[in-house]
Amino acid sequence: VTIYAPFNFAELEINLKQALYDVKGIAAVRYPKGGELPCPAGYVPNFKPYTYLRSGKKAVLLITYGRIFANVLSAAKELLRQGLPVSVLKLTRIHPLDEECVQIARRYSHVLFFEEGSRRGGIGEYLGSRLMAERFSGSYRVRAIEDFLTTCSTASGLHQVGLDVEGIVAAVLAERSSDAPTEEPDEPA
């Protein structure tokens, strides 16, 4: 089974074509209700299973997929403004997970996965198990939905579970504050 999780309508169109014409076997496209979010400046959808936006440092990697990519990218910009550059890995094909995504994550000392879905049995948990099988020695955290939410707006629900911009920034800062200050090596080009 192949599962896509596009961020916006442009990616949705690309993934629907891939599901119909490129995938041999069963394919699904996960797209949340609520319409399209504005596309972040400079982001161009592509046919790849993931998009990797490097900061040049190997300390912190934020991973996500789908709608909350906009929040993760906004949080990354806020963290950079505060002096903490982070890299972002946006998954477009969430199953099967591209092996290169595991290898990218292994290079970081802190990996935080933000998922608008159930923590138990989710993609974040799966990637964590893959990293552990690869003997990943850094820290790995998943921020996802732990329990059922009461009926609320999307914005309110994302805020409740810490998947809004402020919650993502706070999670990264909390993760980094648990660290002793270290010099961050530059990432190879």
Predicted segment positions?
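Thiamine diphosphate
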Residues: 21-189
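Conserved thiamine diphosphate
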Residues: 1-22, 171, 176-177
